A protein has these predicted regions:
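Helix C-cap/helix->beta junction micro-motif
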Residues: 90, 143-144, 313
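Hydrophobic residues in well-ordered beta-strands that form the structural core
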Residues: 69, 75, 96, 148-150, ...
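N-terminal "arm"/small-domain region of PLP-dependent enzymes with the aminotransferase-like
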Residues: 1-25, 30, 226-228, 353
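Short beta-strand->loop structural element characteristic of the AMP-binding/adenylate-forming
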Residues: 93-103, 318
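Phosphate-binding glycine-rich loop
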Residues: 25-72, 86-90, 96-98, 163
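Conserved coil-to-alpha-helix start sites within the AMP-binding
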Residues: 79-84
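Active-site phosphate-binding strand-loop segment of PLP-dependent enzymes
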Residues: 102-184, 189-197, 302, 355
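PLP-dependent aminotransferase class I/II
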Residues: 33-37, 42-49, 109, 121-125, ...
Length: 374
């Protein structure tokens, strides 16, 4: 079976985790701090806060941005459900915007039509590693005095207008799930250059505790913690962080290798009239966290049948990006919205295998089977 994705993990990560275990300091210790510092340097932010996953990163971003009960946050429905869920967690309402039909990223013009006096923030998503139009949304947020939050779960290593994703705004949330570009088993990170946010985020991830174990460990005097706000247990372990440090060292190489495979797919499928391929706008650099193709209505096989035939031939695939407003959990909450572009893209897109290292034979086999079927 050719898998859809798999992490690039080697002896380096195993030894790093092993070394941490031998220290007996396995959570919120020096490796977490090292990973945060190196990640911030990599993306170009002043600070980074390591967390248990990207969903918790989104949740805390909502809190520090001041989003709460009665507020509205504009976001795409076409995204993994955690995007919208993070808004509900704080008692606010996700207001679903349409996506751009070329990039499948949130459409700035439609988003502007949804702004009301209840709108508190806009949550943009860099879909499967393709940067959204950050400058356009920064301008929109400035115009209406809104907060901008970036769901960059899939976008580690992606570049927007010459700068890494993570350097453009004050709350940028990353994921280290195994399907992402780099992994810590699971994990998340918030990149920020806002010192006030940074201070609050560190409190919130550890039950609102005024000091952490590392500070107390290094002190020559006894210290007693205070819990100054209601917080959460959203901490990353040092075992995960040690793996993350090693993964981060390989990130640019992994992105380069993924792009080489993406180029092969783009070249192989470029003349097939029945499909639409990913679009990388000028000044945008995708890490190709996933490679998604869209099947036009003229395609001789529908998406679900194509997925089944490929599975029968030993090729794992997934549907394209979901639409949250059509999931049972959101239907039960009464969300009814008309988003024809998002719905059509979700119903007609398919994600095909892409990982590092991927054998050339497997790449060619995937190409051959898809070309024969579509």
């Amino acid at each position: 079976m050719i898998p859809l994705a798999k992490p690039y993990l080697t002896k380096d990560e195993a030894e790093a985790a092993h070394d941490v275990i031998l220290t007996n300091w396995v959570t919120q210790g020096p490796k977490v701090a090292e990973f945060e510092e190196k990640f911030a340097t990599y993306v170009g932010s002043k600070y980074a806060v390591a967390l248990s996953n990207c969903t918790t990163a989104l949740h805390l971003s909502m809190i520090v941005a001041g989003v709460g009960v009665g507020d509205e946050v504009i976001c795409p429905s076409m995204s993994y459900i955690a995007t919208a869920n993070s808004i509900l967690y704080v008692g606010a309402k996700p207001v679903f915007a349409e996506v751009n039909p070329r990039t499948y990223n949130i459409d700035v013009e439609h988003a502007e039509t949804l702004i009301t006096n209840k709108t508190k923030a806009i949550l943009i998503v860099h879909q499967i590693g393709m940067p959204a139009d950050i400058d356009a949304f920064k301008g929109l947020c400035k115009k209406y005095n809104l907060k901008l939050i970036e769901d960059a779960a899939c976008a580690a290593g992606s570049v927007y207008k010459g700068s890494k994703i993570g350097s453009h705004s004050d709350l940028v949330c990353f994921s280290f799930h195994p399907r992402k570009i780099i992994t810590t088993g699971d994990g998340g990170m918030i990149a920020t250059s806002n010192e006030e946010y940074y201070t609050k985020l560190k409190l919130l991830r550890q039950h609102g505790m005024s000091i952490n174990d590392r500070v107390r460990h290094d002190s020559t005097k006894i210290m007693f913690e205070e819990h100054v706000v209601m917080g959460y247990n959203y901490r990353m372990t040092d075992i995960q962080a040690a793996v993350g440090v090693k993964q981060l060292e390989k990130l640019d190489w992994i992105v380069s290798e993924r792009r080489k495979i993406a180029v092969q797919y783009l070249e192989a499928f470029k003349n097939i009239e029945s499909i639409i391929l990913p679009t990388e706008e000028e000044g945008y650099f995708s890490n190709y966290q996933s490679f998604s193709i869209y099947l036009k209505p003229s395609c001789k096989i529908n998406r679900n049948d194509l997925m089944q035939v490929l599975l029968d031939n030993g090729i794992s695939t997934r549907r394209g990006i979901m639409t949250s407003h059509r999931e049972p959990a959101y239907l039960d909450l009464g969300f009814k919205v008309d988003l024809p572009i998002s719905e059509d893209a979700a119903d007609r897109s398919i994600v095909i295998p892409l990982y590092v290292p991927m054998e050339q034979y497997d790449i060619e086999f995937v190409i051959k089977k898809i070309k024969n079927l579509v």
